[in-house]
Each structure stands twice: as C-alpha cells, then as structure tokens.
Amino acid sequence: MSATPDTRPIADTATHPTADAGTHPTADAATHPANPVARKTIISGLSIHTQMSSVAGAPVVYLLGDVADNSPIQVPEGVCLVNVGVDLWEENFSPWCAPRVFAKGPNFGDGAQKTLDTLINQVIPWAESELTDPPAYRMLVGYSLAGLFSLWAGVTQAGVSPQVARGCQPGAPAAPHVDAPATTFQRIGAVSGSFWFPGLLDYVDQQLSGGVVGLTHAYLSLGDREARTPNPQIMHVRENAELLASKLENAGITSTFELNRGNHFQNVEGRMQKALDWLVK
C-alpha cells in the first residue's frame, strides 16, 4: 500500500541503527562475504552502500531502502549489491503530484525524475567504477512506494512523463532532467508496490505503446490482504497489479505477479528476497 508514515513497514532499529523507525521498509543491505569490496558514501542526499563482486560482468542489484549491514536479505555469489537510502519517499519516489490518500499523510510530489537522474548520472558511475567489465544486467528493486518507483523507472528510462514535465503547481516550469539510456535497468522488482497510484495504468499503457526498449524482466507482488481496505483509492491495488503484469507480459517483457500471504506490513524482507531470487535466476 502507501509508503506514508502511517503505512510503511516498521524498521527494526536493533538491526537498522541509522533508520528512522516507522518511516521506511527494512529492505536493505545483504550479508555477502563473498564480495569483499564494500564502500559507503552520500550522493546528492542518497545514502549509498555497495558490495561489489570481482566477477567479470557480474549483474548489479540496486536495492531501494535504508542502508544497513545486518539485513538477512541475500544475493547470490557473483552478484553486486548497491543499497540506495532515500528520504522523503512521498516526494522522491512519486512520479507526479497527487493528493494524499490518508488524512494524516502528506501529498505526493514529483521528485521521481530527479531521483532517477541521480541514480543514472551519479550513483551508477560511482558504484560501478571499480568493476572490470560492464554488468551483464542491472536490477532496480523496491518495496511499497519504492516499488512504484522501480516500475515507473523501468518504463520511463528513455524519456520523461508529461506529468513530471508540468510540475506540481500550475504554470510551473519543466523540471530539469537528463534522459536515461533505454538500457539502464533491464530488470525491475515492485514488491508490494503502490499500484493504486493515480494515473499509473494510463501512464504504463502510454509508455508501452511507444515500445519500451531494454526492460526484459518485471517482478510484481502484493500481500493477499492489501486490497481489503475501505480506502477507495487503495482497494483496487490487486486488480491494478494483475493488469500491470499482464500489460508488461503482452509487451514482450518476461513478467510475473506473485500473491503473498498477509497485509502490506508482513514479511517485508521475505518478500524482497523472493523478488531478488526470481530476478537473478
């Protein structure tokens, strides 16, 4: 469901000492002793933690979430992991402006394009600077609103949406951006994603009709209780997820939709692990 402070999975402060408890999912770094090259930095406000493989052509997972060292999420030996910590999710993961869906939650901004540009133009060059060869493929994976961002980025890579170009205020100038190469992220995971987000279905239709070059795999999932809500916006989340998976598959993108047990808050790390296992197989 939503990634607002009222609905995000609660971070475990015992294992995530730098996280703001109650604000982000606990989908973070993996213990990966086979990949000894680990670095940390902050790039344009994003907290970056890398564990890079020395294997030539190793795939790279860009995992959206808080940076931590003790998460049980694992990636296979020979796969690189880049954790990307992002604050202000409703601003930085939202592709275009939209009203709040909870009375106490904030409105949604239009910062996703800026976040995507930062990933492509700053984070990726820094993270992959020590690789001997380009990665075989890159994956972008996120939970909740970060999952929405992963899906949006996967179909937006070659351009910018008209919603973003307009800005949040009437008459606002177009937001500056750098068009992403069509093949930046070949695989995406949207885990318990905010598939209810207004305008998402139409936007994906628009992008797919123009041909999405480069995206080859998409993993979508939800909990089987996530649609059981009186909220008129969120109650369609499962229907939308199934439609999105079908649209992606029909566009020639290898796609799957997995229904897990529980609501939005249950087994966050287990669901993220399922996504990674599917994407790297």
Predicted feature residues:
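Non-catalytic cap/lid and distal C-terminal segments of serine-dependent acyl enzymes
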Residues: 3-5, 32-281
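Long, intrinsically disordered low-complexity tandem-repeat segments
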Residues: 7-32
